[in-house]
């Protein structure tokens, strides 16, 4: 009996994907829930597993092919196993993964024919390692990412000197863009082509908020079991500024302006695969600890590739913190259909004039990129001034002033 291999549901509003890699060939034997292939959507990578025991008898779509939900991409000649019944053909086990996922583990292969799970296999392949020479410290001798990294760190590096007669073509590498990278590229270009993007800047004296955090961070963490960072201050300040300037929390819908009376704040997170912007829902109803916890949880899921489409969809305004990478100044690009994005940057000590005297203060540049079709320059400037005043006087945030 032939069982079809079909593309499973990919989440709300997602209908297309790209086959990243098949891990089985025609004629290969497979077991129920064994990894068959990886597919990439706009935001995440998913595993498609075998619906039953059997042999691969047909592969209709190969690596790099675009596919749609419900499309047949192959067939398995089912072999009935008395110990393992065939699973329902429509109930594929899916798991979002990310390159070099620290939680991905695999059985240590007994021979070269064994196939490693995608994230570990990629790390092993990129570093030209033999998995048989890697000692697994996981349960049952399984190999974890840490085992691979330990092997890399303890293996001498040999640097090859390129031959002088090599052509430029031989010294280049062509790699197909992932669906996530293509989506990022397309959305950023669409944003620039559609919106009338303008960026305005201001700077913030971080002295008071740094002092406040230093004074209460240990007590805060002890009570709430989450660290007190600066992002919660900026999220709360941003919400107050959005309430003051509602057009920045709105979007253009055809010939109408859609004003949103809720505050779902997207927080940009960099991952190995690219930038994602998970959303903190109803952030205006959260306390500082709730905001910090939500951001921490979403960032962890992003790095592990476990974000769902619901984590990424929607959002009324976004915040991007290039300061964590050392950025001093930037012009962030709007995440459509939103109308604005706040860019945070590195805090560094600079000489500033305070009451006619030069003092050294920890200063941060902030930037607001906004759609000038819906937001006037005065509104953009007022938005940043509001954030500046709240961060420089954090007691106003705490007292809701």
Curated annotation (Swiss-Prot):
It holds the Pfam family Biotin_lipoyl. Binds 1 lipoyl cofactor covalently. One of its GO terms (biological process) is tricarboxylic acid cycle. CDD domains: lipoyl_domain (cd06849). PROSITE patterns: BIOTINYL_LIPOYL, LIPOYL, PSBD. Its EC number is 2.3.1.61. GO terms for molecular function: dihydrolipoyllysine-residue succinyltransferase activity. It is an enzyme of class 2 (transferase). The modification N6-lipoyllysine is found at residue 43. Residues 2-77 form the Lipoyl-binding domain. The active site is at residues 372, 376. InterPro entries: 2-oxoA_DH_lipoyl-BS (IPR003016), 2-oxoacid_dehydrogenase (IPR050537), 2-oxoacid_DH_actylTfrase (IPR001078), Biotin_lipoyl (IPR000089), CAT-like_dom_sf (IPR023213), E3-bd_dom_sf (IPR036625), PSBD (IPR004167), Single_hybrid_motif (IPR011053). Pathway: Amino-acid degradation; L-lysine degradation via saccharopine pathway; glutaryl-CoA from L-lysine: step 6/6. Residues 115-152 form the Peripheral subunit-binding (PSBD) domain. Gene3D superfamilies: 2.40.50.100, Chloramphenicol acetyltransferase-like domain, E3-binding domain. Belongs to the 2-oxoacid dehydrogenase family. Forms a 24-polypeptide structural core with octahedral symmetry. Part of the 2-oxoglutarate dehydrogenase (OGDH) complex composed of E1 (2-oxoglutarate dehydrogenase), E2 (dihydrolipoamide succinyltransferase) and E3 (dihydrolipoamide dehydrogenase); the complex contains multiple copies of the three enzymatic components (E1, E2 and E3). E2 component of the 2-oxoglutarate dehydrogenase (OGDH) complex which catalyzes the second step in the conversion of 2-oxoglutarate to succinyl-CoA and CO(2). This is Dihydrolipoyllysine-residue succinyltransferase component of 2-oxoglutarate dehydrogenase complex. The gene is sucB.
